[in-house]
């Protein structure tokens, strides 16, 4: 069985993808209007922003950091801000160059998002607010959109999506 798993992770061309480590790089929660906000009727407006940063660590290792920022307002008043930078170190070997950008810009953030979402929802509940449901994100579509907007610009390994 272990042999079979190893073969599925390393195709005939010797390509390899491995998660080395997942970690929280930064975590922040601000609720400037608590406790007064708890006495008001709960009618929030939620805004979520996403950003991805990729750092080449050498020797086929890459750090991918997904930043998820959730801002909740009510009647134009800032209720809370929750932000997490969920990081991961990924080993990516022997993939064609044209596959590297989608792996780092879409595939890796897809792996990181559930962890970031869990950290955000946990912070919000611990802050005394109702649990948030953050919908799944189509990182493939976001990556395509980013690539189209960056067309013509020369890319670097360190970039923000």
From Swiss-Prot:
Pfam families: SecB
NCBIfam families, per database record: PRK05751.1-4, secB
Database matches in Gene3D superfamilies: SecB-like (3.10.420.10)
Oligomeric and partner information: Homotetramer, a dimer of dimers. One homotetramer interacts with 1 SecA dimer.
Name of the featured protein: Protein-export protein SecB
Similarity annotation: Belongs to the SecB family.
Protein role: One of the proteins required for the normal export of preproteins out of the cell cytoplasm. It is a molecular chaperone that binds to a subset of precursor proteins, maintaining them in a translocation-competent state. It also specifically binds to its receptor SecA.
GO biological process, one term: protein folding
UniProt entry keywords in alphabetical sequence: Chaperone, Cytoplasm, Protein transport, Translocation, Transport
InterPro entries documented for this protein: SecB (IPR003708), SecB-like_sf (IPR035958)
Segments passing through the bilayer: none
GO cellular component: cytoplasm
Keyword Metal-binding: no
SUPFAM superfamilies: SecB-like (SSF54611)
Gene Ontology MF term list: unfolded protein binding
Presence of keyword Protein transport: yes
Location relative to the cell: Cytoplasm
